[in-house]
Amino acid sequence: MAVERTLSIIKPDAVAKNVIGEIVTRFEKAGLSVVAMKMVHLSDEKAGGFYAEHKERPFFKDLVGFMTSGPVVVQVLEGEDAVAKNRDLMGATNPKEAEAGTIRADFAETIDANAVHGSDSTESAAREVAYFFSDEEVCPRAS
C-alpha cells in the first residue's frame, strides 16, 4: 500500500447543514490526514473548469449551478490508499444506494446534492489537487 493524496470537496448542501466537522472526523478516524483545507464560494468559471470533463453532459449546467450555490470546503487528504478509502467513506453517488454509515447515506439528500466529491483515481487526484492548491498550500503529515 502506498501513501496517496486525494481531493475532497464538502459540497454546499453539507456545508449548509453544518456537518463539516462530522465529515472531517470520519476522514481522520479512517486514518486520513487533512494536509490542506479552505472554504471557498466557487465562481461559475472555477466550478465549470473543475467539471470541464462533463461540459457536454446534460447535467453540466445544473452541476455548476449547485456547486456555486453556496460555500464549499475543499481539502486534500493524505494516507494509505487515500483515494479508495475516501471513496469507501463517501458511499455510492446516489445516497439512496449508499451503504448505511457512509457520508452520503447519512448526510446527502439526492444524487445532485450528495454532500461530497472525491477523486476517482490517483491521476484525477493529482489534477484536482493542483486545480485548487499550490504546492506551498499542501503540508505533508504522513510519517
From Swiss-Prot:
Q: Report the Pfam families cross-referenced here.
A: NDK
Q: What is its EC number?
A: 2.7.4.6
Instruction: Give the required cofactors.
Output: Mg(2+)
The record ties this protein, via SMART domains, to: NDK
What's any GO biological process attached to this entry?
A: GTP biosynthetic process
Function recorded in the entry: Major role in the synthesis of nucleoside triphosphates other than ATP. The ATP gamma phosphate is transferred to the NDP beta phosphate via a ping-pong mechanism, using a phosphorylated active-site intermediate.
Q: What is this protein called?
A: Nucleoside diphosphate kinase
Query: Which species expresses this protein natively?
Result: Alcanivorax borkumensis (strain ATCC 700651 / DSM 11573 / NCIMB 13689 / SK2)
